[in-house]
Amino acid sequence: MGLPSIETVECDILVIGGGMSGCGAAFESKFWGEDLNVVIVDKAVIERSGATGEGLSAINCYMGQRYGWNTPEDFVHYVVNDMMGLAREDLVYDVGRHVDSSVHLLEEWGLPIWKKDNGEYERIGRWQIPIHGESLKPVTAEPARKAVGKENIYERVSITHLLTDANDPNRIAGAIGFGVRENKIWVFKAQAVIMTSGGASNVFRPRSVNEGIGRTWYSVFATGSAYGLMIPIGTEMTQMEHRFVPTRFKDGYGPVGMWFQYFHAHVENALGEDYTVTRDDELKKYEPYGSAIPTPTPLRNHQMFLDIKEGKGPMYMRTDLAMQELAGGDPAKMDKVREEAWEDFLDMTIAQAMTWASQNIAPEETPSEVVLAEPYIMGSHSGEAGAWVSGPEDLAPPEYYWGYNKMTTIRGLFAAGDGVGAAPHKFSSGSFTEGRLAAKSAVRFVKENSTSVQLNASQVNTLAESIWAPMETFDKYKGVSTAPEINPHYITPKQALVRLQKIMDEYAGGTSALYTTNGPTLELSLIHI
């Protein structure tokens, strides 16, 4: 077949990924580096790219300092407790002290935030404010698009590898990828790169299979590229063994946060028991975190897991009791509560609203099943996998700081969002904030390091050939069998995915293994892989 055409783009700063952190990075890069050429590349379209592409019903990271709600110190205390001690206090504080200004910026750009009659933000939890958030991502993307200019946005381009300097393997030099809708390989040469691509869904076999395939809680398009790009060039990572297992509504994967915090619902097992009450003594095994308020997410999930393991399921979110109590017998209030219940999912998890509708569930009358989902790997939600990055100069201890905030151990490579490890609970607003912080550092790095990077032509050609190799293999052997998915010379991407999921599910602590694993089991999984 021969290689497709190769096109090279040169820039000062390359932003990889157009999610919340990517849009924040692109916008902020042009604010501080007005004279710099900033390029953003995304495998989709930035208006709907990233984990929030479908929308959100709440901002889950907001201090509320203007109202005296919380301080960054409060946030650090909460995050460290929720992660049972495993978190970088400097990185968490850095997000906490800046995130409010990011939320106010999003509101200025047009994000509708729920407000009280006096103009104060509504509040549904200590750190959460409700929004009409179906449009969150387009609202965030528009300023980024305008800031860098349409000529500097490369969409439908999938980045496959990072490139290092020809004379220094510890210096970033750009990236290479391919057009997903055109016959072209793209090479980006950059003085600095900001890694803002996604965490990893679909590594473990989802609970939704066969007819439900493609339905996951975290974005189905989060393929772990933040990690798959940084690790091969030697970037130091942290907390990569951390798996986040969320409690979610069954089958539709609807989040439970709004139901716990705004509707004040609770979960019961089939016997009508509340596991947070009946298993309170279990928490004492995990002090000092067992007595932390609120109870850390891993421990709450562990309490539910024990109920399920002992055969006390199904587990039900008592939406009916919560909605009836909020309405207080007033039909008009019930109409409002019902509207808010459905909007919660229509704003961000339409599949859950469809699940209710298809099963004739009226949440004010019928409780809904909840389950522990399959594990996910990410750095922006309640997971903390990602790169080991330099902290802020005024907060980080000497061993955590090497010149530029959010820079990885590869010079010139910065990270934000899912790409940063040991800094969880950022969610959408915090990821956007972290992208902005990384961009500010990247601009300073470019201005202070003027020596131009050099691409290794041999490296580029080798990677271009490896990118194109699957197409060559398919074209060469497609005639060997009459069914393209059954062939002795290759496997399809879908076949590779389901085989990986089977191995991870059964050997690496997935749902079928009750989230358990051990050394010999993991070693066996490597043999199978």
Regions found by a protein language model. Give the residues of each.
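Core beta-strand elements of the Rossmann-like FAD/NAD(P) dinucleotide-binding domain
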Residues: 9-11, 183-192
